[in-house]
């Protein structure tokens, strides 16, 4: 019984780490792209363009760190679902026609 409980908690921690790494990678990339777009739009100097990319990347990593620390500090075991993508309840046109 104890081995299944430790295995369950280990898989829960692994799921949290997977969700946090996925969230961090996505926010890093999207924020860096946003910084690159803003840098191209507003700045002429390459130094300020790189600075805006770095600023965007820092915002992405910082927000991911905040969310991940909130997930790991939560007492419930369902906290990994906080990072999961929201499930859509909409039905497609073909599904609606079948019903």
UniProtKB/Swiss-Prot annotation:
It is found in: Mitochondrion inner membrane. Keywords: Membrane, Mitochondrion, Mitochondrion inner membrane, Transmembrane, Transmembrane helix. It is a multi-pass membrane protein. InterPro entries: Mic10. Component of the mitochondrial contact site and cristae organizing system (MICOS) complex. The MICOS complex associates with mitochondrial outer membrane proteins. Present in a large lipid-enriched complex called mitochondrial transmembrane lipoprotein (MTL) complex made of proteins located in the two mitochondrial membranes, including the TOM complex and the core components of the MICOS complex and containing at least digalactosyldiacylglycerol (DGDG). Component of the MICOS complex, a large protein complex of the mitochondrial inner membrane that plays crucial roles in the maintenance of crista junctions, inner membrane architecture, and formation of contact sites to the outer membrane. Belongs to the MICOS complex subunit Mic10 family. This is MICOS complex subunit MIC10. It comes from Arabidopsis thaliana.
């Amino acid at each position: 019984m104890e081995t299944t409980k430790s295995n369950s908690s280990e898989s829960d921690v692994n799921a949290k780490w997977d969700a946090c790494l996925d969230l961090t990678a996505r926010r890093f990339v999207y924020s860096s792209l946003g910084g690159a777009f803003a840098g191209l739009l507003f700045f002429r100097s390459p130094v300020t363009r790189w600075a805006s990319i770095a600023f965007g990347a820092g915002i992405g990593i910082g927000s991911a760190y905040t969310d991940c620390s909130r997930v790991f500090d939560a007492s419930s075991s369902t906290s990994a679902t906080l990072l999961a993508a929201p499930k859509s309840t909409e039905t497609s046109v073909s599904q609606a026609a079948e019903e």
